């Protein structure tokens, strides 16, 4: 059974960063419960396929060189874990956020993604 740090890694790198649909599918089977809920600023999506679809939509909308990079250490509780990330060309992110996972029976049952607000001049 994977631990919280492994689930954080898998969610970010093996699902949301993975451009190969078959490898993403295999990772999602290992990482998420069947009824996983993914909640981000665009809405709430339920089920492994819905998570895979959101990952594909994200990757389809950016340049091939964009990557997710961890942006700090993982934070781990008894049934929750969190990881900050940055996204964009390596070393030059265009977005930052944090994934907060709820873990049930060794798999992720909820992914809450918070995205930093765009910086604006005041």
Give a label for each model feature.
Residues 1-31:
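Short acidic-aromatic low-complexity motifs
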Residues 2-5, 45, 52, 108:
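Domain-scale activation on soluble regions of proteins
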Residues 3, 59-122:
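A beta-strand edge to alpha-helix "cap/lid" segment located at domain peripheries
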Residues 12-13, 36, 40, 86:
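Residue-level detector of alpha-helix boundaries and kinks
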Residues 25-77:
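A solvent-exposed, acidic/Ser-Thr-rich amphipathic alpha-helical stretch
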């Amino acid at each position: 059974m994977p631990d919280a740090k492994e689930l954080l890694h898998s969610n970010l790198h093996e699902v949301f960063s993975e451009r190969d649909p078959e490898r993403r599918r295999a990772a999602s089977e290992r990482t998420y419960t069947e009824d996983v809920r993914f909640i981000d600023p665009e809405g709430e999506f339920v089920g492994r396929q819905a998570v895979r679809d959101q990952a594909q939509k994200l990757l389809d909308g950016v340049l091939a060189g964009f990557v997710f990079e961890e942006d700090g250490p993982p934070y781990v509780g008894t049934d929750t874990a969190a990881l900050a990330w940055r996204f964009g060309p390596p070393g030059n992110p265009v977005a930052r956020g944090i994934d907060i996972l709820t873990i049930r029976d060794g798999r992720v049952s909820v992914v809450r993604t918070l995205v930093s607000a765009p910086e604006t001049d005041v």
